[in-house]
């Protein structure tokens, strides 16, 4: 593990810095110099018709301003006084019997970058104090995230709109601490991807490889997964968000291992996500057709990475990836026509139907992307990130090519579009399934910093897959 990451993470999560960033964004959006930010953590929730608790996932905006993973907590930030207060649950004697002593206010003050820690019983009194201290104080909260017992009546004005926007826009640019968390999530997840490739030689089912990935992540400190992982053997890789992860890796017809394994998985480290995709041959060596498609996707990714720096339009990077795909598929004879004609007609969408990437942070599809799902151009409809890349933003770069009959058949059946695809040549590639390569990179002023260390050079992949 990177020792420089350990050094950064030895300090406190910079909640106070984040609170100032959000307050500054509120001011930039025209909402004055004073006021109180109010946020609640996620509540403890029970499984329906059961006495067990649902899996807990902290509200991201609350964590951003507190660094606190506890449920049933609150925070206030007095913008004018620059004072951040965390409110945590008091001791419940019945709970102590089962769960042990909770975190005390003094312990919380040592752990978190806040100015004061009080009991949740003190929230309303503290809110009333802010109002009495200065007439006309305004409170900023998020609609539908305020408990019924909380009262804002003493405040002259309550704003339920701007805080969510301000927090989500502030979260786009990551500080050094956040980048360290993302780097650690990538370090661990990359180790897990390597473990999966090595384990595949003896594995007989997709679920065995999922188990290997999760176990490796947990052993290094990622107790949660960033999202439901994808372990897609053979043609299952043609389904973008394949979910079953329980199919045999041996083809029942031939009795041999399926061609490829697509793994899209990332561990979550202290609420920050990795999102990595790799493809490897289950036999230890790519088939000729698989290698041809892999090489095109790798070129799509490498040329995209070369374009990345602050100020670049993401749509331009995405468009370039489509052009690389078109040139590659033309060379193989799968497509017919000119590059420009195929680009204008959107034929590459039949094989590359999703966006090139998205922002990454506490959420896998992180805030600030501004997608336009109403876009009439099929190449951009599912692009989750639009506009200029921000310096300090973290993006995924995940081009792919898929041989999915459900997507491609309508193109083949179209009198207008079918002429651009050679069905006879295409026939050789259905068994490839899908190839996607995904790295997580920090956008810098003059380029990028790739956080992902999992191997992707095909010769390295084959060596790992073939085993000793």
UniProtKB/Swiss-Prot annotation:
GO molecular function, one term: manganese ion binding
The keyword Protease is assigned to this record: yes
Residues noted as binding Mn(2+) 1 in the record, renumbered to the chain: 275, 398, 438
Residue sites binding Mn(2+) 2 per the record: 264, 275, 438
Top-level taxon of the source organism: Eukaryota
Keywords: Aminopeptidase, Hydrolase, Manganese, Metal-binding, Metalloprotease, Protease
Pfam families documented for this protein: AMP_N (PF05195), Peptidase_M24 (PF00557)
Catalytic reactions on record: Release of any N-terminal amino acid, including proline, that is linked to proline, even from a dipeptide or tripeptide
Entry cofactors: Mn(2+)
Function description: Catalyzes the removal of a penultimate prolyl residue from the N-termini of peptides.
Cofactor mode of binding and number, as noted: Binds 2 manganese ions per subunit.
UniProt protein name: Probable Xaa-Pro aminopeptidase PEPP
E.C. no: 3.4.11.9
Organism the protein comes from: Blastomyces gilchristii (strain SLH14081)
Enzyme class, spelled out: hydrolase
Keyword Hydrolase annotated: yes
Protein's GO biological process: proteolysis
The family this protein is said to belong to: Belongs to the peptidase M24B family.
Stored CDD domains: Prolidase
Taxon lineage: Eukaryota, Fungi, Dikarya, Ascomycota, Pezizomycotina
């Amino acid at each position: 593990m990177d020792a420089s990451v350990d050094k950064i993470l030895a300090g406190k999560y910079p909640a106070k810095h984040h609170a100032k960033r959000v307050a500054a964004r509120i001011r930039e959006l025209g909402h004055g110099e004073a006021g109180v930010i109010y946020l609640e953590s996620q509540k403890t929730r029970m499984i329906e018709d059961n006495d067990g608790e649902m899996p807990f996932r902290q509200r991201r905006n609350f964590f951003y301003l507190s660094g606190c993973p506890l449920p049933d907590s609150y925070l206030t930030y007095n913008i004018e006084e620059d004072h951040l207060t965390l409110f945590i649950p008091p001791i419940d004697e019945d709970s102590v019997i089962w769960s042990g002593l909770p975190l005390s206010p003094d312990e919380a003050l040592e752990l978190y970058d806040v100015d004061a820690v009080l009991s949740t019983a003190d929230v309303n009194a503290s809110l009333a104090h802010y109002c009495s201290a200065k007439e006309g104080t305004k409170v900023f909260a998020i609609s539908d995230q305020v408990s019924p017992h909380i009262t804002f009546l003493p405040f002259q004005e309550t704003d339920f709109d701007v805080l969510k926007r301000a927090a989500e826009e502030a979260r786009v640019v990551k500080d050094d601490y956040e980048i360290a968390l993302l780097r650690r999530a990538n370090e661990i997840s990359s180790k897990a991807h390597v473990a999966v490739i090595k384990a595949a030689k003896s594995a007989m089912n997709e679920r065995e490889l999922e188990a290997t990935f999760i176990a490796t992540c947990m052993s290094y400190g990622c107790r949660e997964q960033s999202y439901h992982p994808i372990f897609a053997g053979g043609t299952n890789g043609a389904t973008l968000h394949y979910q079953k992860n329980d199919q045999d890796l041996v083809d029942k017809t031939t009795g041999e291992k399926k061609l490829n394994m697509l793994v899209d998985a990332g561990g979550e480290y202290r609420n920050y996500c990795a999102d990595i995709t790799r493809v490897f041959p289950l036999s230890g060596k790519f088939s000729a057709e698989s290698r041809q498609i892999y090489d095109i996707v790798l070129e799509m990714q490498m040329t995209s990475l070369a374009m990345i720096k602050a100020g670049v339009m993401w749509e331009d990077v995405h468009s370039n990836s489509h052009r690389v795909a078109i040139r590659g598929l033309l060379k193989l004879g799968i497509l017919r026509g000119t590059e420009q004609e195929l680009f204008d007609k959107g034929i590459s969408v039949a094989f590359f139907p999703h966006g090139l990437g998205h922002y990454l942070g506490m959420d896998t599809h992180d805030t600030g992307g501004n997608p336009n799902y109403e876009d009439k151009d099929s190449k951009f409809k599912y692009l989750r990130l639009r506009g200029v890349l921000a310096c300090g933003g973290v993006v995924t770069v995940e081009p792919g090519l898929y041989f999915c009959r459900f997507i491609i058949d309508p193109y083949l059946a179209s009198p207008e579009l079918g002429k651009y695809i050679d069905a006879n040549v295409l026939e050789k590639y259905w068994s490839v399934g899908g190839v996607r390569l995904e790295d997580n990179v920090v956008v810098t002023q003059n380029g990028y910093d790739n956080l992902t260390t999992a191997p992707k050079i095909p010769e390295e992949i084959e060596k790992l897959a073939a085993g000793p």
